């Protein structure tokens, strides 16, 4: 009886605290603002929200009740150990002085290079593109590729004697990241700084990993031990996102305060239909069950790259057991007539943005459109949490575990086998591929296999350049406009840590276009019998094997030794194939 009274008192006090904070936000104009036009889908969403409220979903989320996602007792502890992101903003606010000191001490560097993949790199990349670097703070570079030309490009941009390298990996064992470390450690020592090489390095990892041990042995200047109960894609508001952000001068305290604001708006005492995170999750989950599983992001130019992070969060969390939500990031906005009935649009705008006529046209045409408005860039803190909650709730609606990634390891294992073959034979195994100049029939055959709800995934194991970006945009637009097929695009191996799980574990509606190029430059990996070029090629072959073993429709196109000409040929082939 006493326990019951204490429980009621605690819940009542939480409710009063939330009401107090919510009323204060209303008076000050703070708090999440969302508008939506769901047309004929509104009743279904309302019913889903009512069901979530009846199931006590908001309270169970914050109580870390694993049965919200799985009834399997074996998964109970595993899921609970992945929900630390719910309270990490408040936890990190206790370290504000640490971030201030880091921002001050980091001014001694001209550049910071973040070495990481997936959840360790995407939030820093968003912050880099959104905020740039404050005057007096170093410039941030994010390296999440094994492409030799890109690695050499970063090396050429920095003064290595004035650079800090952040080695970021939750597991401490990420192949790409450790390869990056080996290369830059060697570069530092080559430049005569062997005695103080460790002063140019910091590590972000879970406690007790092999990376923590390596960092201690090499005398790293900083070692940040992240809370271990947070999965990589949910780690934006932890050290993985905040350390790089603080170094470039982002106001970390205010960004965390915005996240706490959102946490109060999404509190366990806030009903599902008034709860911004639960509401968005209900929309995504319910519409996905009705075939509208392409969450198409349209972002204000001021936060144009926020979708990089959202893409991984949604794809890796929901793409499993043959189910999943396909995030469409970076696809140019088209006229209403080019879209099918498999979309839901989320428009992320900024206060002061002019009306978006393309979005208005989509609403008028009856497409479901959700509009989320940010006050300024620091509202990203709240948006990180809103989308994490929404994705977790969407997972509950789809009845899948939103916190595992059962198929990610598959391509990694295949890559290891390919590398083992290279070590023993001195060459990579062959793969069926077609030159870009002769790819029309293969691409036409691939697109003709598209069923209702299909999407084209462009997987480019190439150097990212303005030319490649323009070519990919042209391919996406042509396919979308002529075939009414949604498109995604990613650079390898980066996308393997993002949408790779969805490709293999999600709905079998994907059409896969793998694009590779011949590397004219290469970089050795110290301590390994293979180079970055060989590693990148092995990763593309490993993923190709994974696709083929699942009998997924895939075409591999080679750009040759002149990527610019190869891209032009590929764009022409696609435009011809969709006529």
What kind of feature is each model-predicted range?
Residues 110-162, 296-338, 483-490, 494:
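Anionic-ligand anchoring segments at beta-strand to alpha-helix junctions in alpha/beta enzyme folds, i.e.
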Residues 25-32, 404, 409, 424, ...:
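C-terminal amphipathic alpha-helical interaction region
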Residues 299-301, 348-352, 459-464, 515-518, ...:
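Structural motif
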Residues 190-344, 377-486, 497:
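Active-site phosphate/pyrophosphate-binding segments
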Residues 101-270, 344, 348-372:
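Glycine-rich phosphate-binding loops that contact phosphosugars or nucleotide phosphates
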Residues 496-529:
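Conserved, well-ordered active-site substructure
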